[in-house]
């Protein structure tokens, strides 16, 4: 029986995000020392050799692995023009990495502040994706085919993908078809795509795995009222997440990101 604690993780970014991705990856390594193995798959959208060397140097310090995968080749089946950077869609194609059945994906604007090993014990059953519930304009929830009863997950900060099931159910091609149906520009881009295609097979993670800005800005009852949500976390769950976050997601709304001057994010000092 194999009891090794192995984290398989993915990032997708262009060269100008390499600095932020590097800091996120460093925080991942630093807060998961107890993992037996960490493999980081980087979907490479023209990252320069100097930045690849820097990223490999971070991995070497922690005795971890970085694997670069050419994004253009990985996404070649999505033969449609889009207004958005192709890196944004990278997570839709991770099932092509056949040696991985369970993958954590991160955006570059995340900082890992705790162990993620408990995620390895989650029973995904028939769930295609697990993530933290997000706050979204009800109009866009309707646009992607969901109702107020559905819990929309944030696919930007951190999600857990059941790639074994993605391959079995051909989810990659279903995502491509959805993107093409909107001529390359579906509502909420990759997030809208994942929430639509996986709408009946999502698992909700505790909020500490993707602490997002609205959780700091509004009390729970106001969030439910503003976004017409029937189900959300309790105020106690949010407060506990703020005290002991596992991942902080520095999104651009409500607060400036911490690499900008005059950032007002309440956890900017962690960055």
For the regions a protein language model found, what residue spans apply to each?
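A glycosyltransferase accessory/donor-loop signature
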Residues: 1-13, 20-23, 161-163, 168-271
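Hydrophobic targeting segments
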Residues: 6-11, 28, 39-42
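Histidine-anchored nucleotide/phosphate-binding helix
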Residues: 18-33
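Active-site-proximal specificity loops/subdomain of glycosyltransferases
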Residues: 51-97
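GT-A fold catalytic core of metal-dependent nucleotide-sugar glycosyltransferases
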Residues: 68, 72, 87-138, 151-154, ...
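Short, charged, surface-exposed secondary-structure boundary motifs
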Residues: 77-79, 138-143, 214-216, 259
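Short, surface-exposed amphipathic charged segments that create phosphate/polyanion-binding patches used
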Residues: 79-88, 144-148, 219-225
């Amino acid at each position: 029986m194999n009891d090794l604690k192995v984290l398989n993780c993915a990032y997708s970014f262009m060269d100008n995000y390499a600095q932020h991705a590097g800091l996120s990856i460093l925080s991942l390594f630093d807060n998961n020392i107890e993992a037996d193995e960490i493999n980081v798959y980087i979907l490479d959208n023209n990252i320069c050799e100097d930045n690849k060397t820097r990223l490999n140097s971070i991995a070497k310090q922690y005795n971890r692995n970085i694997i670069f995968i050419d994004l253009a080749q990985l996404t070649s089946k999505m033969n449609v023009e889009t207004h958005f950077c192709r890196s944004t869609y990278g997570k839709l194609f991770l099932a092509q990495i056949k040696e991985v059945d369970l993958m954590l994906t991160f955006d570059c604007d995340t900082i890992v502040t705790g162990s993620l090993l408990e995620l390895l014990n989650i029973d995904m059953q028939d769930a295609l994706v697990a993530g933290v519930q997000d706050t979204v304009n009800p109009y866009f929830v309707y646009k992607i085919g969901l109702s107020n009863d559905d819990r929309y997950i944030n696919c930007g900060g951190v999600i857990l993908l059941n790639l074994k099931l993605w391959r079995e159910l051909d989810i990659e091609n279903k995502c491509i078809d959805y993107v093409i149906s909107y001529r390359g520009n579906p509502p909420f881009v990759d997030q809208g795509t994942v929430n639509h295609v996986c709408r009946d097979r999502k698992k909700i993670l505790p909020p500490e795995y993707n602490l997002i800005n609205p959780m700091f800005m509004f009390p729970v009852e106001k969030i439910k009222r503003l976004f017409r949500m029937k189900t959300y976390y309790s105020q106690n769950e949010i407060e506990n997440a703020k005290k002991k976050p596992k991942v902080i997601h520095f999104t651009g709304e409500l607060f400036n990101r911490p690499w900008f001057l005059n950032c007002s994010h309440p956890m900017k000092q962690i960055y």
